[in-house]
Amino acid sequence: MYLSPAEIQILLHAAIELVAAAGLGAARALGIMLILPVFTRSQIGGLIRGCLAIAFGLPCLAHVSDGLQAPDPETSLIQIPLLGLKEVFVGVLLGTFLGIPLWGLQAAGEFIDNQRGITSPSTQADPATNSQASAMGVFLGITAITIFVAAGGVEAVLSALYGSYSIWPVYRFQPTLSTQGAVELFGLLDHIMRTTLLVSGPVVFFLGLIDISMMMLRRFAPQFKSGQLSPPIKNIVFPIIMVTYATYLLEGIKLEITQADGTLGWLDKLLK
């Protein structure tokens, strides 16, 4: 059975529309995966991320495919790629909101290591992300990702992804921006710093007490070299502090990560 040229053209047109719809449906999910630490580990390759993005976008395929009939055929070659870029940007925005607790916790690890005398030049690159990171930063980062997944973080990602279409639809280029949205954006940056200080605060406090003790000891014994002995003492006491603090730390991490359910609220405040 042979197909006529008209039927072949119809099939090709349908195939192109399907590919375009699948690409637009997966673009927002792909944007999330480009920035959310859960998906940026080197063990998750580009092929896996691409397949996951397409799978996450399948429920929206019918809606996106119906909307492809609206653009003018003469300008669709320009509109569709621009829509794809816009969708990736929205995904990056969502990934930023979802990743704030994870980045805050990793920054807390960096802050703790800096306080106990382990600075960046002496640290090795994180083998999972090929980026510069301290030992405690890597540990808290991996712990945060594990708790994020175990506490239903993937469900929160999907909920934010699908709910975002009602706030910023696929075929709307420009969002609704306001001054309040800019204030909310700075509030999110403040949230990262607040998380960092709250998580690292107790550990840094005890390490600071060691510094103060060393300075007082040097005042009464000038021959005592506190600058050389302070880092070893900190590294000896540090495991004891972390074992004592571990239970409260894990509860705090879990509480912070479960706030990822408010991603849609943040996006709505930012755009409105």
UniProtKB/Swiss-Prot annotation:
GO terms for cellular component: plasma membrane. Could be involved in the secretion of an unknown factor. This is Probable translocation protein y4yN. It is a multi-pass membrane protein. Belongs to the FliR/MopE/SpaR family. NCBIfam families: fliR_like_III. It comes from Sinorhizobium fredii (strain NBRC 101917 / NGR234). Coiled coil: none annotated.
